């Protein structure tokens, strides 16, 4: 596998997957790397579009400015990974461990994060439109300024989740417990999609009628 043009000169783009490997700005698209040990790997700017990374060990890895568009990362360990400004269009993180990961300004449009563990993750100003968080753990996560338009939060956990200025246009909140979330205001709910089972923080009232139905 050759490095991308302009890739960092010392990056070992042809090196085999290994803990701490340097794949900075390398092209690793459409490969099969399921279960690979990439713990602490240096992969800033690297491309993994369409790559199979299911069950990969990527704890503490650096994928800043990287790309995982349509990649499969189900069950991967990305705990404490640096994923700042990561591109992940339609990427699958189902059941992945993203505990404490830094996803600041990442673009995860239509990503599947169902049943993922995002506890204490940093998702500030992250693009999460139409992302699926069904059954995800977002306890203690920071979603300040994130765009969750039309995202699905059904069955997600949001204990201590910071939702300050989070955009929630048509966000699915059916049956979601937001009672211990932080920074939520009534104006965000006026454009969201909840139901009678949606629990809100003390002092915040639900809209008289939620603005959308289950088919939206």
Predicted regions and their residues:
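Bacterial N-terminal signal peptides
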Residues: 1-6
């Amino acid at each position: 596998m050759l490095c991308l043009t302009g890739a960092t000169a010392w990056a070992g783009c042809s090196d085999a997957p290994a803990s701490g490997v340097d794949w900075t700005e390398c092209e690793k698209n459409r490969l099969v790397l399921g279960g690979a040990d990439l713990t602490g790997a240096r992969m800033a700017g690297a491309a993994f579009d369409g790559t199979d990374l299911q069950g990969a060990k990527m704890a503490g890895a650096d994928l800043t400015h990287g790309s995982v568009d349509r990649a499969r990362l189900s069950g991967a360990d990305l705990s404490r990974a640096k994923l700042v400004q990561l591109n992940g269009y339609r990427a699958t993180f189902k059941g992945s461990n993203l505990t404490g990961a830094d996803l600041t300004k990442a673009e995860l449009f239509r990503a599947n994060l169902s049943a993922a563990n995002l506890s204490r993750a940093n998702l500030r100003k992250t693009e999460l439109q139409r992302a699926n968080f069904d059954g995800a753990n977002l306890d203690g996560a920071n979603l300040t300024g994130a765009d969750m338009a039309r995202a699905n939060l059904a069955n997600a956990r949001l204990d201590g989740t910071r939702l300050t200025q989070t955009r929630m246009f048509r966000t699915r909140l059916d049956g979601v417990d937001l009672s211990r979330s932080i920074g939520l205001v009534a104006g965000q709910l006026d454009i969201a999609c909840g139901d009678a089972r949606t629990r809100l923080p003390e002092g915040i009232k639900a809209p008289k009628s939620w603005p959308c139905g289950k088919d939206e």
